[in-house]
Amino acid sequence: MKNNNKFWILFGLTILLSLSSQLFGQVNRVLNISPTAHETSVGNQSLFFRSPAHNFFTKDDSLSQVTFTRMNWLGNITEGMTFNYVEGNWKDFDISLTYMDYGQQKHTDDMGVILRNFSPNSFIVYLGWGTQLNYKDIPMKNTFIGFSGKFIKHDLFTEKGSGLLLDAALHQKNILDLFDLDVMLNNWGYAPKIGSVSTEIPTNIGIGTTIEKNNLTFYNQWNFYKGYYTHGQGVKYRYNNFLNLKMGYFNDVEYKLNYPTLGIDLKYANYVLHVGYIGGSDNLPLRNTLLTSINVEF
């Protein structure tokens, strides 16, 4: 009997450690979350809104801005998970801070007595820079490049880890007088190590196109990971420079995340309110997620 009990105890520990390793290994997926409502509502168009090369192209030297986002995450399956994001644009630089709180957890002893509460979390610091590309000291009117770095730290209570990731981006404007092109290598570098577990980095090559026709803007973006890809598409209707109506669709076959998105932007003076909504089927963990971002220009 003792040998039999010992077998099941060892078996259970093996399964538990395996699950922990898988969870730790996937913790960097926080990097794939679209942090603002205006990005999410057109099918997660991260290149158009956050590529350092594209941000430099759209930069107004007289304008700086700050964006704030806070939302409940995976509210259909858990409580207490929050996503918090703040971004600032100044001259040629973009700076952002991301804080993901995975919700309050309980640490118990072997008898089930609660010893303390804790909140595992992830923290990301981002710095991006862009510039116009020169050829033989002559500026190339339609070509821009950008680079960015991310410091990421995970605090999972019993284990901690940090890493450094880099991005490189290209923005090519007005190809064939039809569309703009964004290309970006995302998330390559030193992966955080959680205890003895090596984490997986969501390294990918992103390709995005943008077409503007009168008051309509059409977006497409493909993200190519090792062995699979995701695709987002969206459209924005602009009305009198104070109202945007948006819709999109995101498709991730590998992780079975397929959902429509909706959004609206309202601008008053130097303030812009972005509201986004994620729809989807009843079994989608992200279903009915509401995102609100506030943009302040100065």
Regions found by a protein language model. Name each.
Residues 10-20:
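Bacterial N-terminal signal peptides
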Residues 2-11:
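Bacterial N-terminal signal peptides that target proteins for export
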Residues 24-298:
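Subset of outer-membrane beta-barrel
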